[in-house]
């Protein structure tokens, strides 16, 4: 969120006070293009997709819309923008964002140090005050106009190559399927904040509080390998293919194991196919979306399908073709950014030396479970929605020229695809 509330924000602030500069026109054009995609980050309830490190800043999520409103003359567009701002601030005011002294806390929807960064301090959350820059609007028009509900975005699908994601909208919620975003630095829990399969307004992601046990790792919408008593979280995967219909990545936790994952973005159901090529034995956990653990929670593992229900959330995952088993993880307290207590459905499969594949079906929604599109997995690829996707080549890297050539070719392909 530092992209909208910093880079675009200050560019528009410059454009507001230096309109004679030619660069100001460029800044406004860039923000207009950005706004088309950024609008999809917000649910009908007002909350935005929890993604990245810049989450303790609360309703700074709408700071971009506050400054952008200065440049909008169209009544309908301005009404939509005002609605986004109002709903987001109201949603935040309904969360536990104040401490016992009345100050904004460090955390997302409640005080939570597990998700914080080393640079956070008591005043960090007050970046949210940047959102009140709409008070600088030169006319009273913004304040007099009625705020509108969001336009009907149901079943919207948009691929955004700049953030390696496909965003979809369903039943009033936003879903961002992610493949390729990395943050290889000293910040905490980067694999949780950037590298999960899915981020959604349906439920915020979880962060790890300990490397002992899946209840402490809390890897919603991600993978875990277990070898003996050691756990390895999916991180630093490589993009093999990215578009609005399929996302393919390869994760190599070490040289003896390769897991190529095919994700077909869809809601409320989506498929994850994991092609495993291994020289050792291990367990593979695949987790669905977290669900608030409250008094209305119902857990079910009937027919080897793990589903969690409460009043306004449904999350489930199961394995096709009877591979492995499905269960539900009761997570340790305070791992989730939105709820102090959550549960996560998951599948677990044992793999021996060799090449294997597993097909998992995930559900995320707020209403009754709907029928899912059929998928076929063959020895040479996947057939889904009348399109055949051949399996990608797996290779184990070494110091040979062939291995180095493949690595260079893959990087070039990724760069070319990005600029296309």
Question: What role is predicted for each listed range?
Answer:
Residues 1-149:
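Extracellular polysaccharide-recognition and catalytic grooves
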Residues 16, 22, 29, 36, ...:
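Context-gated lysine
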Residues 17-35, 78-88, 133-155, 187-217, ...:
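Contiguous hydrophobic segments
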Residues 123-293:
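Non-catalytic C-terminal accessory modules of carbohydrate-active enzymes
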Residues 215-419:
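Extended repeat-based interaction scaffolds and adjacent low-complexity, acidic/S/T/P-biased segments
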């Amino acid at each position: 969120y530092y992209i909208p509330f910093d880079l675009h924000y200050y560019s528009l602030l410059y454009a507001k006070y230096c309109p004679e500069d030619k660069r100001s026109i460029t800044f406004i054009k860039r923000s207009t293009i950005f706004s088309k995609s950024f609008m999809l980050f917000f649910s009908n309830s007002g909350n935005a997709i929890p993604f990245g490190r810049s989450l303790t800043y609360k309703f700074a999520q709408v700071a971009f819309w506050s400054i952008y409103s200065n440049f909008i003359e169209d009544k309908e567009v301005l009404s939509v923008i005002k609605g986004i701002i109002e709903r987001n601030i109201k949603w935040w005011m309904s969360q536990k964002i104040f401490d016992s002294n009345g100050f904004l806390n460090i955390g997302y929807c409640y005080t939570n140090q597990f998700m914080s960064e080393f640079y956070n301090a008591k005043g960090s959350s007050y970046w949210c005050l940047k959102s009140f820059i709409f008070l600088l609007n030169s006319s009273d028009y913004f304040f007099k106009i009625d705020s509108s509900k969001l336009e009907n975005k149901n079943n919207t699908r948009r691929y955004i190559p700049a953030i390696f994601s496909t965003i979809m909208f369903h039943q009033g919620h936003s879903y961002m399927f992610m493949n390729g975003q990395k943050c290889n630095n000293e910040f905490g829990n980067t694999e949780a904040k950037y590298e999960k399969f899915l981020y959604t307004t349906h439920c915020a992601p979880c962060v790890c509080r300990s490397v002992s046990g899946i209840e402490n790792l809390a890897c919603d919408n991600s993978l875990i390998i277990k070898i003996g008593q050691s756990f390895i979280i999916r991180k630093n995967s490589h993009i093999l293919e990215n578009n609005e219909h399929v996302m393919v990545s390869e994760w190599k936790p070490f040289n003896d194991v390769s897991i190529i994952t095919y994700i077909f973005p869809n809601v409320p159901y989506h498929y994850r196919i994991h092609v495993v090529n291994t020289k050792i034995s291990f367990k593979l956990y695949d987790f669905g979306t977290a669900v608030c653990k409250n008094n209305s929670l119902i857990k079910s593992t009937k027919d080897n399908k793990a589903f969690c229900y409460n009043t306004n959330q449904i999350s489930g995952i199961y394995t096709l073709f009877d591979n492995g088993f499905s269960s539900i993880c009761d997570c340790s307290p305070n791992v989730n950014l939105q709820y102090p207590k959550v549960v996560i459905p998951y599948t677990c499969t044992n793999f021996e030396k060799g090449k294997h594949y597993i097909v998992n079906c995930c559900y995320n929604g707020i209403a009754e479970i709907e029928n899912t599109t059929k998928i076929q997995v063959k020895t040479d690829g996947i057939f889904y929605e009348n399109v055949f996707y051949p399996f990608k080549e797996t290779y184990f890297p070494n110091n040979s020229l062939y291995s180095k050539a493949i690595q260079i070719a893959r990087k070039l392909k990724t760069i070319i695809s990005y600029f296309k």
